[in-house]
């Protein structure tokens, strides 16, 4: 464990990795080092398979977005998933392979090979599915099966993993007896809960946490503590199960940081808009600033097939309040496996949400982008403005969708463009 990035930071060392991150993020190497040492910043990578893109997540850094992809039991199309990787490479900062159908090892290795980004997984999926195929029951996987799967995926180059360690057997039993609208919506969490109930045993991640830390330290990979009991309906947000699991996750995160292992915490989920800021502040208070990786949040249950729009509202507010990594949501959420196009729609929505949040969280540093666009828009310098937009290619297509404008303005106002008239009046004043 002595050579993990946290250990090096605690020794006061600033190495080439830290300098590279600091330069990319526009922060001082000393501040970055101190935040890594405290567990407030994580560097997403596997030392055995460094990704092309440098990705650091946490305090004082730009908000990052994660793109989920992967096969289902109903749709196994590797070519399509690899096209989604290309979308992630263009728009995202990290990606997760959530495949549950087909040859999981082959799919994961193909995704890692194609990706320019750090790749994450949920290892219990593979342990559960392989046990189901071999023993006719997913909950029949052994603890050795689970940890062998984790080690195999780390050896393949997986940089971070969702580990549902914070749900206890007692909490699992109580949530299933509760009056929650939807007791459990986490697929990986459900698999761990099923294992605990089938085996009448405590969460294997929880009972073997120290061994798990040793595994991750070998690769300096990041543990992302999953939220098995995250609210799947706005009515369930911040109930005893949601908050109780977050408290346990905070305890586990502190143990990981003490051991020199990088860690994030995952968050909701479905949360009313008026509670989004509060849930971010709560995580930061409980953990001392451990990076928060949130799904959405989605502030309404009624928006499908427009959940990418609805959740981007929650995501922007979450980022402004201090969320560090946003897990995107696509138009297919709650309805279907997403297509390549839907993956891109979700990724773009979240790229915009992340920037909106950063304008608040990082201030002038993030707002320079907006200021440049507005400068050129106000002077009708269309080429300069368009190439600075979030999606210049689509922007140009929209700008010319009725043919090249016949006047200096666009086809919306035409000759009555207010900026054009202001420019002419300003010239007269001079």
Curated annotation (Swiss-Prot):
Annotated substrate binding sites: 68, 96, 125, 164, 186-188, 227-230, 266, 293
- Coiled coil (UniProt feature): none
Enzyme class, broadest EC rank: lyase
Keywords, A to Z?
4Fe-4S, Iron, Iron-sulfur, Lyase, Metal-binding, S-adenosyl-L-methionine, Thiamine biosynthesis, Zinc
Binding-site residues, Zn(2+): 270, 334
EC annotation?
4.1.99.17
Needed cofactors: [4Fe-4S] cluster
Catalysed reaction equations from the record:
5-amino-1-(5-phospho-beta-D-ribosyl)imidazole + S-adenosyl-L-methionine = 4-amino-2-methyl-5-(phosphooxymethyl)pyrimidine + CO + 5'-deoxyadenosine + formate + L-methionine + 3 H(+)
- Indicate yes or no for the key word Iron: yes
Q: What is a single Pfam family found in this protein's UniProt entry? A: ThiC_Rad_SAM
What does the entry give for GO biological process? thiamine biosynthetic process; thiamine diphosphate biosynthetic process
Q: Name one GO molecular function term.
A: lyase activity
- Give the pathway: Cofactor biosynthesis; thiamine diphosphate biosynthesis
- What does the cofactor field's note say? Binds 1 [4Fe-4S] cluster per subunit. The cluster is coordinated with 3 cysteines and an exchangeable S-adenosyl-L-methionine.
Q: According to its UniProt record, which protein family does this protein belong to?
A: Belongs to the ThiC family.
Q: Which NCBIfam families match?
A: PRK13352.1, thiC
Matching PANTHER family, A to Z? PHOSPHOMETHYLPYRIMIDINE SYNTHASE, CHLOROPLASTIC, THIAMINE BIOSYNTHESIS PROTEIN THIC
What is the documented function of this protein?
Answer: Catalyzes the synthesis of the hydroxymethylpyrimidine phosphate (HMP-P) moiety of thiamine from aminoimidazole ribotide (AIR) in a radical S-adenosyl-L-methionine (SAM)-dependent reaction.
Q: What is this protein called?
A: Phosphomethylpyrimidine synthase
Q: What organism is listed for this UniProt entry?
A: Pyrobaculum aerophilum (strain ATCC 51768 / DSM 7523 / JCM 9630 / CIP 104966 / NBRC 100827 / IM2)
Q: What is the lineage of its organism?
A: Archaea, Thermoproteota, Thermoprotei, Thermoproteales, Thermoproteaceae
Gene symbol? thiC
């Amino acid at each position: 464990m002595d050579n993990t990035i946290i250990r090096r930071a605690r020794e006061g060392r600033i190495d080439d990795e830290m300098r590279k991150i600091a330069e990319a993020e526009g922060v001082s190497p000393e501040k970055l080092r101190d935040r890594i040492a405290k567990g407030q910043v994580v560097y997403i990578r596997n030392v055995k398979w460094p990704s092309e893109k440098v990705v650091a997540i946490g305090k004082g850094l730009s908000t990052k977005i994660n793109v989920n992809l992967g096969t289902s039991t109903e749709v196994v199309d590797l070519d399509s998933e690899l096209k989604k990787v290309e979308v992630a490479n263009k728009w995202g900062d990290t990606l997760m392979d959530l495949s549950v159908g087909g040859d999981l090892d082959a799919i994961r290795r193909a995704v890692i090979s194609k990706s320019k980004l750090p790749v994450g997984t949920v290892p219990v999926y593979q342990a559960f599915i392989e046990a189901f195929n071999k023993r006719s029951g997913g909950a029949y996987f052994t603890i050795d099966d689970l940890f062998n799967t984790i080690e195999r995926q780390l050896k393949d180059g997986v940089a971070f993993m969702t580990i549902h360690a914070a749900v206890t057997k007692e909490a699992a039993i109580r949530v299933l007896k509760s009056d929650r609208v939807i007791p459990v919506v986490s697929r990986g969490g459900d698999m761990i809960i099923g294992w605990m109930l089938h085996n009448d045993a405590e969460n294997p991640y929880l009972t073997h946490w120290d061994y798990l830390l040793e595994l991750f330290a070998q690769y300096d990979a990041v543990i992302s503590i999953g939220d098995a009991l995250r609210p799947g309906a706005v009515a369930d947000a911040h109930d005893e199960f949601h908050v109780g699991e977050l408290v346990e996750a905070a305890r586990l995160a502190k143990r990981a940081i003490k051991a020199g292992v990088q860690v994030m915490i995952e968050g909701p989920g479905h949360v009313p808009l008026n509670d989004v800021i509060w849930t971010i502040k709560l995580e930061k208070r409980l953990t001392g600033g451990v990076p928060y990786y949130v799904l959405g949040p989605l502030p309404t249950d009624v928006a499908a097939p427009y959940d990418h729009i609805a959740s981007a509202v929650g995501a922007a507010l979450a980022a402004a309040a201090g969320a560090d990594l946003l897990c995107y949501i696509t138009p297919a959420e709650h309805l279907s496996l997403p297509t390549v196009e839907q993956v891109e729609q979700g990724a773009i929505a979240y790229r915009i949400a992340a920037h909106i949040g950063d304008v608040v969280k990082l201030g002038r540093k993030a707002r320079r982008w907006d200021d440049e666009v507005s400068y050129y828009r106000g002077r009708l310098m269309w080429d300069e403005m368009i190439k600075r937009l979030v999606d210049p290619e689509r922007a140009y297509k929209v700008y010319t969708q009725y043919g090249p404008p016949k006047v200096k303005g666009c086809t919306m106002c035409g000759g009555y463009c207010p900026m054009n008239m202001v420019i002419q009046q300003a010239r007269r004043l001079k």
